[in-house]
Amino acid sequence: MSTPFYVSPQQAMADRAEYARKGIARGRSLVVLQYADGIVFVGENPSRALHKFSEIYDRIGFAAAGKYNEYENLRIGGVRYADLRGYTYDRDDVTARGLANVYAQTLGTIFSSAAEKPYEVELVVAEVGETPEGDQIYRLPHDGSIVDEHGSVAVGGNAEQISSYLDQRHQDGMSLAEALKLAVQALSRDTNGTQREIPAERLEVAVLDRTRPQQRKFKRIVGRQLDRLLEADGATTEAESSAEEEDE
């Protein structure tokens, strides 16, 4: 009778982590940045039907890189959690921190379970506050850990290189146009350092805008508004975007 093949727990977990990281790295990168009036989500996404960014609740947004079917299940679960908690208690009781804890428990349980493969996803949960100091951004890797981020964060693809680029250039108080242009510049850098062009139609952009009078702060930026933000300069573009939003 042959001896059963033994794999140490440490090696098994390392193999699962490597498997998940490789799956996430195959996806396209996305970035989340704070700007003066909120938080902006930017990613390269040629599909108009499958979104990387979504609204979870009034002030909370969701971003994900990796396998679409896996993070879509997590997104739907997050929406249900937020709706139930807001209905049972109060809308103010729905927070990004609470949602991040729920996602962390789910991802951690799946990652440590030998009965199923780990999720090939990396999540970002963001909440816009009344002031920039109240903004919250949490990154959740495949193993269910929670990383509290400030300023900017990148996930998927060559996230490490993009994060380094953003850390050197991102500043507090940037306008939406400035933050968007910085995000596109970061996403346009290939692993060898060369710059490529990403057309506007391949970009997915959304914001959590604290200045919106509506209770729900999440808004997608598309079409002419996106073109103006990419082409024009800060103050003029911000005024045009605000006026366009009021007209909608």
UniProtKB/Swiss-Prot annotation:
GO terms for cellular component: cytoplasm; proteasome core complex, alpha-subunit complex. Pfam families: Proteasome. The formation of the proteasomal ATPase ARC-20S proteasome complex, likely via the docking of the C-termini of ARC into the intersubunit pockets in the alpha-rings, may trigger opening of the gate for substrate entry. Interconversion between the open-gate and close-gate conformations leads to a dynamic regulation of the 20S proteasome proteolysis activity. Keywords: Cytoplasm, Proteasome. Residues 229-248 are annotated as: Disordered. It is found in: Cytoplasm. InterPro entries: Ntn_hydrolases_N, Proteasome_alpha, Proteasome_alpha-type, Proteasome_asu_bac, Proteasome_sua/b. Pathway: Protein degradation; proteasomal Pup-dependent pathway. CDD domains: proteasome_protease_HslV. Component of the proteasome core, a large protease complex with broad specificity involved in protein degradation. HAMAP family: Proteasome_A_B (MF_00289_B). Belongs to the peptidase T1A family. The 20S proteasome core is composed of 14 alpha and 14 beta subunits that assemble into four stacked heptameric rings, resulting in a barrel-shaped structure. The two inner rings, each composed of seven catalytic beta subunits, are sandwiched by two outer rings, each composed of seven alpha subunits. The catalytic chamber with the active sites is on the inside of the barrel. Has a gated structure, the ends of the cylinder being occluded by the N-termini of the alpha-subunits. Is capped by the proteasome-associated ATPase, ARC. This is Proteasome subunit alpha. It comes from Streptomyces scabiei (strain 87.22).
